[in-house]
C-alpha cells in the first residue's frame, strides 16, 4: 500500500475525501471535503452515471488542492456479502482453494462473477474447524468503482468493504 493514501468515499449522495497525516500521537486531519452528487447517480451501491462520479471526484480534488493520487476506496450495498463460516481445518496453503470451493455454498452470486476474500477469525474452534469471515463482492461493482477512480486520474491502492473500513478506522483511533 502507498505510504500516504487519501480515503475516498464514493457514496450515494456525495463524494467525500479525507487526508490524514501520521503524527507522534496518532493521526492529524490535513484535508476533508465533500462534493454532492445528482440524485440517482449511485443507487444501492451501483454506479449509474460514471461520468458524473468522475467529474465530482475531479472537482473535489481541485477544490481541496489535493496532489496525492493514491486512494483507498470501499464498496458497500447489495453487491457485497459478508458471512461468518466454518471450514474443515487444513494447511494454510490449501485454505485459499478450499474457501473458493466452499464459497459457492454461501454466496448468492456465481463464483465467476465475484471477487472473494476472507479473514481467519479463529484458526481452530472447539469442533476442530477454522472460522472465518467470507467476503464476496460483485466483480462488476468492484471494476466500476476502480474505473471511476482511474478515470479521475487517481490510483486505487486499497479496495475495502465499507463496514471493515469503518472498523479499521475505529481501531486505529482507539487502540
Predicted regions and their residues:
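Non-catalytic, solvent-exposed interaction/assembly segments
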Residues: 1-102, 142-146, 151-155
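Active-site neighborhood for divalent-cation/phosphate handling
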Residues: 74-174
